[in-house]
UniProtKB/Swiss-Prot annotation:
It comes from Lactobacillus acidophilus (strain ATCC 700396 / NCK56 / N2 / NCFM). The gene is rpsE. Belongs to the universal ribosomal protein uS5 family. NCBIfam families: rpsE_bact. GO terms for biological process: translation. One of its GO terms (molecular function) is structural constituent of ribosome. One of its GO terms (cellular component) is small ribosomal subunit. This is Small ribosomal subunit protein uS5. Gene3D superfamilies: 3.30.160.20, 3.30.230.10. InterPro entries: Ribosomal_Su5_D2-typ_SF, Ribosomal_uS5, Ribosomal_uS5_bac-type, Ribosomal_uS5_C, Ribosomal_uS5_N, Ribosomal_uS5_N_CS, Ribsml_uS5_D2-typ_fold_subgr. Transmembrane segments: none annotated.
Amino acid sequence: MANRNDSRNNRRNKDDIEDQLVAVNRITKVVKGGRRMRFAALVVVGDKKGRVGFGTGKAQEVPEAIRKAVEDGKKKMINVPKVGTTIPHEVIGHYGSGNILLKPAEAGSGVAAGGAVRIVMDMAGISDVTSKSLGSNTPINVVRATIDGLKKLRTSEEVSKLRQPERA
């Protein structure tokens, strides 16, 4: 009887994609009649097997904003190349004034990363990585810079294919 509420608390969908809330902001618009409140949600989605994305959503209520953000995140998913449980090489992701340095780590060392970067790595299924956040520390900038860094990753096969001259 202890697992009665599991279906409500489990955020795993039919297509095996999980989501995790990063931040919720309250937005206030001042109108003639007073203040109009809305909410903006930032969500990271992933299957923990190498696919990850993020989405934002705005609505009058928090649950609706989260739902919109999850839908947006599923549309913008990317594939992340992995070597075992880590990333193939060191990379720097940029977005605005936010920069994220991602370095591969030995197996078993864990995710050495702060808040938003840790969530992105967890959703991507990367369990051994070291990161350093430089510049902006706003959650949306950090998530976008991390995703940019993950987009830049290449496997050794892709790099060797690019280096080989074409033969006619």
